[in-house]
């Protein structure tokens, strides 16, 4: 028979072991996942790359591929940047807002942008990013979506990111960030109130570029190996892909192939969607 002292010691050890096991089990359950599933960047459970890849919060997350030694700043030269923005009219608000310096400052927070895979992969990713930015902003002319304030970009089903009825979640910035379910997590990741101050994306050029890079690294970069067409689908597939708007798709492709030419890299396959 155990003495009371020994019994209490064993009980304490048992409790500690149970608590430790419970803690390990619940690490992947903060968003309702079982321990063998990943909690995605959006708070959903699963075990594929959509859940365990980029942005995975908890669980058996996949290790990201190692970054290469490419210098994005050496590829995105002032000449390259000017070649885009110089095509915007002098009256464009974006001329006084967007700059290579703001892009590079924002880039400091996204160390994997343009640095995954081979040197050619990096150049293709950079070309793809600026192709979409060129299309979305009209060569850095527009900061905000034309007539965006008149449009409703509040998805009430995205209850995790409740809309402020006095705010609009229309397109802003280089990638034209839209919808409350993008402004909310982007603000959390970057450090601004995306739901209550979405206009920050149109007033702070560094934050503006950060939202574009946030969207890119979380929503677009995971599919970039599938070709430029996959990046179109990730950005605006519902409105453009599968024959919905072939003219717009071709416009994006033209920008992409032109930038690939400027950066000295083959554009690859699967250019359309």
Curated annotation (Swiss-Prot):
<keyword id="KW-0325">Glycoprotein</keyword>
<dbReference type="GO" id="GO:0006952">
    <property type="term" value="P:defense response"/>
</dbReference>
<feature type="disulfide bond">
    <location>
        <begin position="33"/>
        <end position="45"/>
    </location>
</feature>
<dbReference type="InterPro" id="IPR023346">
    <property type="entry name" value="Lysozyme-like_dom_sf"/>
</dbReference>
<comment type="similarity">
    <text>Belongs to the glycosyl hydrolase 19 family. Chitinase class I subfamily.</text>
</comment>
<keyword id="KW-0146">Chitin degradation</keyword>
<keyword id="KW-0732">Signal</keyword>
<dbReference type="GO" id="GO:0016998">
    <property type="term" value="P:cell wall macromolecule catabolic process"/>
</dbReference>
<feature type="domain" description="Chitin-binding type-1">
    <location>
        <begin position="29"/>
        <end position="63"/>
    </location>
</feature>
<feature type="active site" description="Proton donor">
    <location>
        <position position="136"/>
    </location>
</feature>
<keyword id="KW-0119">Carbohydrate metabolism</keyword>
<keyword id="KW-0611">Plant defense</keyword>
<dbReference type="GO" id="GO:0009617">
    <property type="term" value="P:response to bacterium"/>
</dbReference>
<dbReference type="GO" id="GO:0006032">
    <property type="term" value="P:chitin catabolic process"/>
</dbReference>
<dbReference type="GO" id="GO:0008061">
    <property type="term" value="F:chitin binding"/>
</dbReference>
<dbReference type="InterPro" id="IPR001002">
    <property type="entry name" value="Chitin-bd_1"/>
</dbReference>
<dbReference type="InterPro" id="IPR000726">
    <property type="entry name" value="Glyco_hydro_19_cat"/>
</dbReference>
<feature type="disulfide bond">
    <location>
        <begin position="38"/>
        <end position="52"/>
    </location>
</feature>
<protein>
    <recommendedName>
        <fullName>Endochitinase EP3</fullName>
        <ecNumber>3.2.1.14</ecNumber>
    </recommendedName>
</protein>
<feature type="glycosylation site" description="N-linked (GlcNAc...) asparagine">
    <location>
        <position position="24"/>
    </location>
</feature>
<keyword id="KW-0147">Chitin-binding</keyword>
<feature type="region of interest" description="Catalytic">
    <location>
        <begin position="70"/>
        <end position="273"/>
    </location>
</feature>
<dbReference type="InterPro" id="IPR018371">
    <property type="entry name" value="Chitin-binding_1_CS"/>
</dbReference>
<dbReference type="GO" id="GO:0000272">
    <property type="term" value="P:polysaccharide catabolic process"/>
</dbReference>
<feature type="glycosylation site" description="N-linked (GlcNAc...) asparagine">
    <location>
        <position position="270"/>
    </location>
</feature>
<dbReference type="InterPro" id="IPR036861">
    <property type="entry name" value="Endochitinase-like_sf"/>
</dbReference>
<keyword id="KW-0378">Hydrolase</keyword>
<feature type="glycosylation site" description="N-linked (GlcNAc...) asparagine">
    <location>
        <position position="157"/>
    </location>
</feature>
<keyword id="KW-0326">Glycosidase</keyword>
<feature type="glycosylation site" description="N-linked (GlcNAc...) asparagine">
    <location>
        <position position="47"/>
    </location>
</feature>
<keyword id="KW-0624">Polysaccharide degradation</keyword>
<comment type="function">
    <text>Probably involved in hypersensitive reaction upon Xanthomonas campestris infection.</text>
</comment>
<feature type="disulfide bond">
    <location>
        <begin position="56"/>
        <end position="61"/>
    </location>
</feature>
<feature type="disulfide bond">
    <location>
        <begin position="31"/>
        <end position="39"/>
    </location>
</feature>
<dbReference type="GO" id="GO:0004568">
    <property type="term" value="F:chitinase activity"/>
</dbReference>
<dbReference type="GO" id="GO:0010262">
    <property type="term" value="P:somatic embryogenesis"/>
</dbReference>
<dbReference type="GO" id="GO:0009611">
    <property type="term" value="P:response to wounding"/>
</dbReference>
<dbReference type="GO" id="GO:0008843">
    <property type="term" value="F:endochitinase activity"/>
</dbReference>
<dbReference type="Pfam" id="PF00187">
    <property type="entry name" value="Chitin_bind_1"/>
</dbReference>
<dbReference type="Pfam" id="PF00182">
    <property type="entry name" value="Glyco_hydro_19"/>
</dbReference>
<keyword id="KW-1015">Disulfide bond</keyword>
<feature type="signal peptide">
    <location>
        <begin position="1"/>
        <end position="28"/>
    </location>
</feature>
């Amino acid at each position: 028979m155990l003495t009371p002292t020994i019994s209490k010691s064993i009980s304490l050890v048992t409790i500690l072991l149970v608590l430790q096991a419970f803690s390990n089990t619940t690490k992947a359950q903060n968003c309702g996942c079982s321990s063998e599933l990943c909690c995605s960047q959006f708070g959903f459970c699963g075990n594929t790359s959509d859940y365990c890849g980029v942005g995975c919060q908890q669980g058996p997350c996949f290790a990201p591929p190692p970054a290469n030694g490419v210098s994005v700043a050496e590829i995105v030269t002032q000449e390259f940047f000017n070649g885009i923005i110089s095509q915007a009219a002098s009256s464009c608000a974006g001329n006084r807002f967007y700059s290579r310096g703001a892009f590079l400052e924002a880039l400091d927070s996204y160390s994997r942008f343009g640095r995954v895979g081979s040197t050619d992969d990096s150049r293709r990713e950079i070309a793809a990013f600026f192709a979409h930015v060129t299309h979305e902003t009209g060569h850095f002319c527009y900061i905000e979506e034309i007539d965006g304030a008149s449009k409703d970009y509040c998805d009430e089903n995205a209850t995790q990111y409740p809309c402020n009825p006095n705010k609009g979640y229309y397109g802003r910035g280089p990638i034209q960030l839209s919808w409350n379910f993008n402004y909310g997590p982007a603000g959390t990741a970057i450090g601004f109130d995306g739901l209550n101050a979405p206009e920050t994306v149109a007033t702070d050029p560094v934050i503006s570029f950060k939202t574009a890079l946030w969207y890119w690294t979380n929503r677009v970069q995971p599919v970039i190996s599938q070709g430029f067409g996959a990046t179109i689908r990730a950005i605006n597939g519902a409105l453009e892909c599968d024959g919905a708007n072939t003219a717009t798709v071709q416009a994006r492709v033209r920008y992409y192939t032109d930038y690939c030419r400027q950066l000295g890299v083959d554009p690859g396959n699967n250019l359309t969607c």
